Amino acid sequence: MNFFPWLTIIVVLPIFAGSVIFFLPHRGNRVIRWYTICICILELLLTTYAFCYHFQFDDPLIQLVEDYKWINFFAFHWRLGIDGLSIGPILLTGFITTLATLAARPVTRDSRLFHFLMLAMYSGQIGSFSSRDLLLFFIMWEFELIPVYLLLSIWGGKRRLYSATNFILYTAGGSIFLLMGVLGVGLYGSNEPTLNFETSVNQSYPVALEIIFYIGFFIAFAVKSPIIPLHTWLPDTHGEAHYSTCMLLAGILLKMGAYGLIRINMELLPHAHSIFSPWLVIVGTIQIIYAASTSPGQRNLKKRIAYSSVSHMGFILIGIGSITDTGLNGAILQIISHGFIGAALFFLAGTSYDRIRLVYLDEMGGIAIPMPKIFTMFTSFSMASLALPGMSGFVAELIVFFGIITSQKYLLMPKILITFVMAIGMILTPIYSLSMLRQMFYGYKLFNAPNSYVFDSGPRELFVSISIFLPVIGIGMYPDFVLSLSVDKVEVILSNFFYR
């Protein structure tokens, strides 16, 4: 057993190193920017080293466990650990945050605070994915909301205060339900609170109480995912945020909600999940159709991409609701896949805006000729978003399809109906993706503009785009990169379910 506190170092390094930013010499933004990038790279290398040399990939149990007593009064422990379910999101967080920091080069106003908030958000997200104590999970969940709110309200667009307030009201409202669920689970059946996740997993609850806990946790995670009808904060938030913030929102923040559904609703409350799983599948199916049919009506480019995130979340819900190892593995693969694709689309939307200063699709047109590199990368990631074979989105959606078809929980006719509606959603997705490309890159509008000369993608934008594109292609060609991490853990989670 390895007793070195790898996870504690990985969690606290970004925020402590970020605090040093305020004491760096005043020599322009270059020093701050490179210092932040170096911290992110060091963190990613540390994480990769710890996982490669100290994590047993064929062991479904919690590994790299750290347990330190923190507050005696409430039996509160600093308890961290990882398994096959959390290792993928943690590596995704490190990768996307490093590239988002590189993408934030145009930010010059209050650069110290901006980069500190990105590193603080990094710590909160890693802490959420590696927490093995329910109260610590809640604290980390709340902690990373503060940097997001400040990043939105200070460096956003014209309606940034409205979107930031909308975001914090929704997420804080959901967090009330999360806190009630955590305290309810921790205080049940004992005079002393038991917030240890392993103890709570082995605890049995009355069905009525388990359903109440399940609904509370579900509301909290539905806001963050987002799941309709609690998704209305998302388009405004993405529409106003700086694109480096959008990369973190789409790539990591939304995935925390899906992770919470699997980690707590599914693993901690299996009986209630078995009852509610048909509703998850129904909501997921509606979500695919709703978002795919609403997206073409969005004039704002970033809002249209935001609705595609809502549509992709529908596949994750169906995978979670299928209660099969195939479906759940597909949902986990979709979490990782869309983390890359969503971050890349928002990055390219932001770099396009930096050049043409247009955000409404009906004002764009003809960008493909002056910006061929951005056109190529945008087209490639749009194809990945609409699940083109050979890319990660296709494999994830296909595995979810097989998961729901092979599920023993549902009768044949409901499965055929759900599959049919999912197929309609997959047909609608190319419509809004390809129409977005047509409005942006084809036609002649840009040539009629007074300042029609624009620069194409530079080395920085090309490096970020290719860095995200390689894993999208890699996972599409060889999905076992991700599936091999989670397959053993998925079997353990599903061993608690009974088809009754």
Swiss-Prot record:
InterPro entries, sorted: NADH_Q_OxRdtase_chain4 (IPR022997), NADH_Q_OxRdtase_chainM/4 (IPR010227), NADH_UbQ_OxRdtase (IPR003918), ND/Mrp_TM (IPR001750)
Catalytic activity: a plastoquinone + NADH + (n+1) H(+)(in) = a plastoquinol + NAD(+) + n H(+)(out); a plastoquinone + NADPH + (n+1) H(+)(in) = a plastoquinol + NADP(+) + n H(+)(out)
Localization per record: Plastid, Chloroplast thylakoid membrane
EC number, as in UniProt: 7.1.1.-
A Pfam match: Proton_antipo_M
Keywords (A to Z) from UniProt: Chloroplast, Membrane, NAD, NADP, Plastid, Plastoquinone, Quinone, Thylakoid, Translocase, Transmembrane, Transmembrane helix
Topology in the lipid bilayer: Multi-pass membrane protein
Gene Ontology biological process terms in this record: ATP synthesis coupled electron transport; electron transport coupled proton transport
Keyword Repressor set for record: no
Bilayer-crossing regions: 3-23, 37-57, 84-104, 111-129, 134-154, 167-187, 208-228, 242-262, 272-292, 305-325, 330-350, 386-406, 416-436, 462-482
A single GO molecular function term of this UniProt record: ubiquinone binding
Keyword Zinc applies: no
Top-rank taxon, per record: Eukaryota
An annotated GO cellular component: chloroplast thylakoid membrane
Enzyme class: translocase
Family: Belongs to the complex I subunit 4 family.
The protein, known as: NAD(P)H-quinone oxidoreductase chain 4, chloroplastic
Organism of this sequence: Panax ginseng (Korean ginseng)
Gene of this entry: ndhD
